[in-house]
Amino acid sequence: MITSQTPITVLGAGSYGTALAITFSRNGSPTHLWGHNPVHIAQMQTERQNYRFLPDVIFPEDLHLESNLAQAMEYSQDILIVVPSHAFGEILIKIKPHLKAHHRLIWATKGLERNTGRLLQTVVEEQLGTQYPLAVLSGPTFAKELAQGLPSAITLAANNEQFAREFQSRIHCSKGFRVYINSDMTGVQLGGAIKNVIAIGAGISDGMGFGANARTALITRGIAEITRLGISLGANTNTFMGMSGLGDLVLTCTDNQSRNRRFGLMLGKGLDAQMAMENIGQVVEGFYNTKEAYLLAQRQGVEMPITEQIYQMLFCGKNAQDVAISLLGRACKGE
């Protein structure tokens, strides 16, 4: 029987992976946090904090640091992957030789596969097979607030109901971290990926000084785009009204803790994409997801005008003013 005291291994020592590891550890699970950089892991072990990505949050005593992947995976049945989407396929290749029949895989990576636009579940099943219980963790949770223990809520979608309920019980905390179960893995994955694209648009709008009305319109029409794409792929429309859909979208579009929103703000103020990303200094998932989301929408025959215009700006040289003109000048239509 899996309990909150059962060990878990988190793969990925960035800000979000560290925050989740802290959350598990505080909730009673012996937690092993793996990172690919031995120097970084050694530094965290000494300082008992992730000074590089999540400074001033001290690790719980039962949070263990590990730079050896094989050893990290030996400790636990449940393996939680928290790496950028562009590194997701690579980490699957690395863990494959160390997987055992009892392992269960969860990921909190938000994005689509680079160059294909495929859902990460598809990538997992292609590379590792379909024999493992799978789950995705997604929702409106900034790493810093999560690590500080501030109230948060998130969605857990799994391909096995028993797995979902067991995993929910080990992370759900009555003191302020709520976990909602959902069986719609497609919808939960899409919500987490495409919201980053819309957040860039909201940032661009605010950077250009368009105000709260325009931002709210982008959020509202953005959830409509995400829902249309989700329906075309068999997702449940209700998913997009939940934590991993509207919840994550609103958070990412309205708070400057969001890298994607800050990236958009800089674009709206006239910086180019390369300079904006350098200023942020961490991965901007929405930059890469924009291209994949646009190409996925084209393949599915789904109209996604906000996504299309952001794609035109990031990859085809269109400027912010012309993007705004294109969106505002669209033909009248029903809601």
Swiss-Prot record:
Its EC number is 1.1.1.94. This is Glycerol-3-phosphate dehydrogenase [NAD(P)+]. It is found in: Cytoplasm. PROSITE patterns: NAD_G3PDH. It comes from Haemophilus influenzae (strain PittEE). Pathway: Membrane lipid metabolism; glycerophospholipid metabolism. Disulfide bonds: none annotated. One of its GO terms (biological process) is glycerol-3-phosphate catabolic process.
